[in-house]
């Protein structure tokens, strides 16, 4: 099985040296992502205008394709089959064999890319093959604009490449081609989408979380960060830094006037994140702020927030409306996380100012004990995001993990609905119920609490995190099922 990876167009217009660097980085990223497949026959080979992937294990095709569609820097992926040919009629015969079943009852067109010296042009092949397919396939019709099926062929000297399928890629730049950034992540719609947008633009995104809601809040945000990394950025190691910001909030509530609290809190977050960024050599902060979305996000207030630090602050969503942000969250898979994530920042100020005055803000901050800010930053927890799974095991030692179920146990499948549909969980004599992880916080209480529930997910990470969360909420009838 062979895949041809086409580069994002912005890569192809770079200078020769920059383009080569981008291609090398993309090739390395692909190898890092695919190494989890443990396929000894897998080969990744870079070329000037594309990257080839070959494997002798055809069963891995769907997994390879799925992984590639989530690697930044790829425009599209072609699933291809290389053949030799003798003449133009032979090209038609091979195309007919490959596409006969696909084109029955469909409109189609033929598109050919050709390299090398031949007695025919690309247009000649398109007309000859298209006409032949039209004559030999029942109810198939040629339609050059917006056909139902496009038959893609590539001819390189004496080699014919049949393109069996085309899959759209993520686009953007390969991660690592730009410098590192630190995303201020809250787990909501905005911070998840803004993190994704910087990953797609080639940045390795680290995460900084300001904990205002206890360990349950931290667990939820870790889930979002781990999901984003695992889905779009697993080619690189990244940090997850958690800062206990409750002492800072307490100091603000005690020392700062109500109307100024929102802006002061954001300035404190920027100061703390800037210290973290400087510690790890990160060049910029990323936030999910959008102009005018909340009181602290007016131009006047954003300028004052920026002035709290010399560190560059990137706001990829600055001109996006909320509906567009939610749509993007839905596309990348973070919507369900965000729906159930509590928003703590908005509750500390009852009458927030929309046009803060610098002198007033500085006066309010003069009452603040900055040693508290320094202390929480120094005590920040820094973990490799890959260790979140191991950390969850340590945190839930009080939650029993079992490999066998009793007849009275209820197996609770907490995987996402699409995963449940793809691999339904069935065990003889055991009651199996489905409740996606993002609904546990709101719907677990509705279940029969006289029963014992064993939480299940594919790798055991989400089930452990959710078991810890439910334990903290006072539920003692939960365990983790790991067969």
UniProtKB/Swiss-Prot annotation:
Database matches in HAMAP family: ThiI
Binding sites annotated in the UniProt record for ATP: 184-185, 266, 288, 297
SMART domains in alphabetical order: THUMP
Protein EC: 2.8.1.4
Domain THUMP: start-end pairs: 62-166
Cited CDD domains: PPase_ThiI (cd01712), RHOD (cd00158), THUMP_ThiI (cd11716)
Stated family: Belongs to the ThiI family.
GO molecular function: ATP binding; CCA tRNA nucleotidyltransferase activity; tRNA binding; tRNA-uracil-4 sulfurtransferase activity
Subcellular location: Cytoplasm
Protein name as catalogued: tRNA sulfurtransferase
GO biological process, one term: tRNA 4-thiouridine biosynthesis
Gene3D superfamilies, sorted: 3.30.2130.30, HUPs, Rhodanese-like domain
Pathway entry: Cofactor biosynthesis; thiamine diphosphate biosynthesis
Catalytic center residues: 457
Domain Rhodanese: 405-483
PANTHER family listed in its UniProt record: TRNA SULFURTRANSFERASE
GO CC terms: cytosol
Membrane spanning residue stretches: none
Alphabetical keyword list: ATP-binding, Cytoplasm, Disulfide bond, Nucleotide-binding, Redox-active center, RNA-binding, Thiamine biosynthesis, Transferase, tRNA-binding
Record keyword Disulfide bond present: yes
Role played: Catalyzes the ATP-dependent transfer of a sulfur to tRNA to produce 4-thiouridine in position 8 of tRNAs, which functions as a near-UV photosensor. Also catalyzes the transfer of sulfur to the sulfur carrier protein ThiS, forming ThiS-thiocarboxylate. This is a step in the synthesis of thiazole, in the thiamine biosynthesis pathway. The sulfur is donated as persulfide by IscS.
Reactions performed catalytically: [ThiI sulfur-carrier protein]-S-sulfanyl-L-cysteine + a uridine in tRNA + 2 reduced [2Fe-2S]-[ferredoxin] + ATP + H(+) = [ThiI sulfur-carrier protein]-L-cysteine + a 4-thiouridine in tRNA + 2 oxidized [2Fe-2S]-[ferredoxin] + AMP + diphosphate; [ThiS sulfur-carrier protein]-C-terminal Gly-Gly-AMP + S-sulfanyl-L-cysteinyl-[cysteine desulfurase] + AH2 = [ThiS sulfur-carrier protein]-C-terminal-Gly-aminoethanethioate + L-cysteinyl-[cysteine desulfurase] + A + AMP + 2 H(+)
Disulfide bond residue pairs: 345-457
């Amino acid at each position: 099985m062979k895949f041809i990876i086409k580069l994002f167009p912005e890569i192809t217009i770079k200078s020769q040296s920059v383009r080569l660097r981008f291609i090398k980085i993309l090739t390395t990223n692909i190898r890092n992502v695919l190494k989890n497949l443990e396929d000894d026959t897998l080969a990744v080979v870079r070329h000037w205008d594309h990257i080839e992937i070959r494997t002798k294990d055809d069963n891995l095709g769907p997994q390879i394709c799925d992984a590639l569609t989530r690697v930044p820097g790829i425009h599209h992926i072609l699933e291809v089959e290389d053949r030799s040919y003798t003449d133009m009629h032979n090209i038609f015969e091979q195309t007919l064999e490959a596409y006969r079943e696909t084109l029955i009852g469909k409109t189609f067109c033929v598109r050919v890319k050709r390299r090398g010296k031949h007695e025919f042009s690309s247009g000649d092949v398109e007309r000859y093959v298209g006409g032949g397919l039209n004559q030999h396939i029942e109810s198939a019709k040629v339609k050059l604009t917006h056909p139902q099926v496009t038959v893609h062929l590539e001819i390189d000297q004496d080699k014919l490449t049949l393109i069996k399928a085309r899959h759209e890629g993520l686009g953007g730049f390969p991660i690592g081609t730009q410098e590192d950034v630190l995303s201020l992540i809250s787990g909501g719609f905005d911070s998840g989408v803004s993190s994704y947008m910087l990953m797609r633009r080639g940045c390795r995104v680290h995460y900084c979380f300001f904990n205002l809601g206890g360990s349950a809040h931290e667990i939820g945000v870790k889930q979002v960060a781990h999901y984003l990394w695992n889905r779009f950025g697993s080619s690189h190691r990244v940090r997850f830094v958690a800062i206990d910001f409750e002492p800072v909030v307490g100091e603000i509530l005690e020392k700062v006037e109500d109307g100024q609290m929102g802006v002061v809190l954001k300035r404190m977050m920027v100061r703390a994140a800037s210290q973290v960024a400087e510690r790890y050599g990160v060049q910029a902060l990323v936030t999910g702020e959008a102009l005018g979305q909340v009181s602290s996000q007016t131009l006047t207030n954003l300028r004052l927030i920026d002035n709290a630090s010399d560190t560059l602050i990137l706001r990829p969503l600055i001109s996006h409306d909320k509906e567009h942000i939610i749509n993007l969250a839905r596309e990348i898979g973070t919507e369900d996380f965000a729906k159930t994530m509590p928003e703590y920042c908005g509750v500390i100020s009852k009458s927030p100012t929309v046009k803060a005055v610098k002198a007033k803000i500085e006066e309010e901050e003069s009452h603040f004990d900055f040693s508290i800010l320094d202390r929480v930053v120094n005590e920040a927890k820094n973990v490799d995001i890959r260790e979140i799974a191991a950390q969850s095991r340590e945190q839930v030692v009080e939650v029993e993990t079992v490999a066998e179920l009793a007849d009275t146990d209820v197996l609770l499948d907490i995987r996402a609905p699409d995963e449940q549909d793809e691999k339904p969980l069935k065990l003889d004599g055991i009651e199996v119920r489905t409740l996606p992880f993002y609904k546990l916080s709101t719907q677990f209480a509705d279940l029969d609490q006289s029963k014992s529930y064993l939480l299940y997910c594919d790798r055991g990470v989400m089930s452990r995190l959710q078991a810890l969360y439910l334990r903290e909420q006072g539920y003692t009838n939960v365990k983790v099922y790991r067969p």
